[in-house]
């Protein structure tokens, strides 16, 4: 079955070198995105073995996985994938902002799951720079959506200032 998703990083289509690996599957040489549980259980030895690692933060039914649990591993992670399971679950926005603003993460923050057209720009403003989108989404449509709104009401992880802050300065 062909992949129904494509990866857009920093506004350009990208070949995805990363593989999501479940907790029971042994890691190969390829770069792997693993669960937070596996990172805590095996992270130190995987880092010592020189594995190229990423982690996925799951949203969960009632409460998502705690981004602060990444702190001991953050310098060794190249990718943090944030799950957006349904449109109405916005915890991933806060997770991305915490990673960028409070924890200083400069690697790839990837939105996975229900990553929809009208959310891309807001996700980007919160620090997400990589998006798994449906394979039929054109790069032109993606970049057009990213520039759709020229003003924002709230401050975010990006340098754009909110309308109220611009008005009073």
Language-model segment annotations:
Residues 140-167:
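C-terminal helical cap(s) of enzyme catalytic domains, especially alpha/beta-barrels
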Residues 43-50, 67-76:
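Acidic (Asp/Glu)-rich catalytic clusters
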Residues 1-42, 47:
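N-terminal, charge-rich interaction modules
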Residues 31-33, 52-56, 79-81, 108-110, ...:
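Structural preference for beta-strand elements that scaffold enzyme active sites
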Residues 38-46, 87-99, 139-148:
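Active-site-adjacent beta->alpha loops and helix N-cap segments on the catalytic face
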Residues 126-146:
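Glycine-rich phosphate-binding active-site loops on the catalytic face of alpha/beta enzymes
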Residues 55-57, 65-71, 117-130:
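Catalytic cores of alpha/beta
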Residues 109-117:
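Glycine-rich beta-to-alpha transition loops that act as phosphate-gripper elements at the mouths
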């Amino acid at each position: 079955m062909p992949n129904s998703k494509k990866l857009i990083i920093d506004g350009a289509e990208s070949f995805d070198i990363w593989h999501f690996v479940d907790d029971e599957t042994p890691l190969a040489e390829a770069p792997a995105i693993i669960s937070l549980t596996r990172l805590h259980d095996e992270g130190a030895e995987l880092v010592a073995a020189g594995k190229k690692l990423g982690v996925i933060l799951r949203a969960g039914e009632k409460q998502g996985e705690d981004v602060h649990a990444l702190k001991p591993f953050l310098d060794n992670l190249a990718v943090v994938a944030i799950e957006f399971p349904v449109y109405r679950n916005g915890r991933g926005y806060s997770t991305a902002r915490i990673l960028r603003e409070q924890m200083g993460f400069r690697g790839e923050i990837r939105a996975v799951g229900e990553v929809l057209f009208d959310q891309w720009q807001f996700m980007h403003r919160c620090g997400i720079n990589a998006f798994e989108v449906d394979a039929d989404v054109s790069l032109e449509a993606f970049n057009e959506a990213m520039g759709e709104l020229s003003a924002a009401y709230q401050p975010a992880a990006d340098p754009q200032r909110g309308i109220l802050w611009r008005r009073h300065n």
